[in-house]
Each structure stands twice: as structure tokens, then as C-alpha cells.
Design a protein with these regions (language model features):
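Trp/Gly-enriched beta-strand/coil motifs that build multi-repeat beta-propeller-like domains
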Residues: 1-232
């Protein structure tokens, strides 16, 4: 997503691969107005616009009005979420007021998601810049420049951060984008460049120094970069 427009293509393969020049335009404008835009593992696109939550298949042409065709699955209150994301089985996780919740995604506009969701983190979750899952169901998080990994918390008092594996000691807050794709590779944008590699396995693993450069310059212009991640 760049300059309010929405594009799709398979990921770049090398540093000089002109991704945006060869990508298909599937949305002409307004897409940067979404606070959250992300995929369910089945390929359904979910988005928060204002205080409302929508879902629909992704657009297939630039002339399509996605939001007019989408199903409203949340009528109000969704602007409070700092982070919203799916695990690879399609369970929705959300962070608000420092707390972490999980539940199946809402199915209609009056579905009281947060009122019936399971609280799996009582506080402190606001410190994370990124939270996301890999295809195997491990939860990754970036806070204070550090990169953590662990199975997701299963109850409200589960000390996830304190018992997670540290897989990066510094510098991870500099990334503008950080996410997995279905191939199990970790993709990241930092200083306008786009990289990919297997995820770091230990704290001193020099991910950026050994990652493959797949995009030179301009990648910081994207508000969202995303793909569906189903269970591997």
C-alpha cells in the first residue's frame, strides 16, 4: 500500500526487482485511511476504518469499492486497538489499554468481541511495536529494540515476555515493517530497504547482516505490507 493505492504481486526476488512497477493496482485511493489492514489465514481481508471493522475478499480490480462491498463485523469501538492480528489458525488477537485479548473474529456488526474475548495478558502489552505469528504458531514481538519469541500466552497471568526466547538484542525497533509470509521467511523494511531471511534463532544472530536484500529504496513509503499466513 503506497500513496493511498493498493497493489499486489508476489514478493520481490532480488534487489533490483521493480515490484511496484510490475504489481497489479487493485485499489486507486483511500487505503491509507485504514488504521489496521490485515489478512485472515484463509485470504479474507480485514480492516479498521474509523471505529468500524470490515471484512471481505481482497479487491480484484482498481475500480472496485471494497468498503462498500465489505461485511461490517464491528459497528463501533475498534479504533481503540493498538494492534490487531491473526494467528495461523484464524484466532484474532488484539491489544488495547496494555491488555491482550483473543477470540474468533466477529461475524456481525453487533458481535461484542472484547466483551466475550479471553484475556491472555493483563498489562504491559502496549510496549510492543510489532506482534505477529509465524506459520508454526509462535508469537513474535518487538519491544525496546529487542525481538522475542514464544508460544502465545494461554492465560491472563502468563508472563510471556519474561519467559520468551530473546532472538534479537537491539535495533529491531528501527524496522518500519516486520512480518512473516507463508514460506516461513521473515520479511522486514528498514531504512527504505526490503530484506528477507529465516527468522533469527538466538540473541546474537545477525539477521540484517545475513538477510537477502530484495528491495533497494522506497519501501518506507508503504503503510501496509502483508500476506495471508496459514498454519505451516
Amino acid at each position: 500500500m503506497n500513496n493511498g493505492r493498493f497493489y499486489k504481486r508476489y514478493p520481490p526476488q532480488h534487489a533490483l526487482d521493480n515490484w511496484i512497477g510490475t504489481a497489479e493496482l487493485i485499489g486507486r485511493g483511500g487505503w491509507t485511511n485504514f488504521k489496521h489492514l490485515f489478512f485472515h489465514p484463509d485470504g479474507t481481508l480485514y480492516g479498521v476504518w474509523g471505529n468500524k471493522f470490515y471484512k471481505a475478499p481482497p479487491p480484484t480490480s482498481a475500480s472496485q469499492s471494497w468498503i462498500d462491498e465489505a461485511t461490517l463485523v464491528g459497528a463501533a469501538g475498534w479504533q481503540v486497538f493498538q494492534l490487531l492480528f491473526f494467528d495461523p489458525h484464524g484466532v484474532l488477537y488484539g491489544v488495547t489499554d496494555g491488555k491482550l485479548y483473543r477470540r474468533s473474529p466477529p461475524t456481525h456488526s453487533l458481535d461484542d468481541w472484547i466483551g466475550s474475548a479471553t484475556l491472555v495478558g493483563t498489562g504491559g502489552w502496549h510496549v510492543f511495536k510489532f506482534l505477529f505469528f509465524d506459520p508454526q504458531g509462535f508469537l513474535y514481538g518487538v519491544e525496546n529494540g529487542k525481538f522475542h519469541k514464544r508460544s502465545p500466552p494461554c492465560h491472563a497471568n502468563d508472563n510471556w515476555l519474561g519467559s520468551s526466547t530473546l532472538v534479537g538484542t537491539a535495533g529491531w525497533s528501527s524496522f518500519q515493517q516486520l512480518f512473516f509470509m507463508g514460506d516461513g521467511q521473515l520479511y522486514g523494511v528498514v531504512n527504505g530497504n526490503f530484506y528477507k531471511r529465516s527468522p533469527p534463532a538466538y540473541s546474537m544472530d545477525n539477521w540484517l547482516g545475513s538477510a537477502k536484500l530484495i528491495g533497494v529504496g522506497g519501501w518506507s513509503g508503504f503503510k501496509f505490507l502483508m500476506a495471508p499466513v496459514a498454519h505451516g
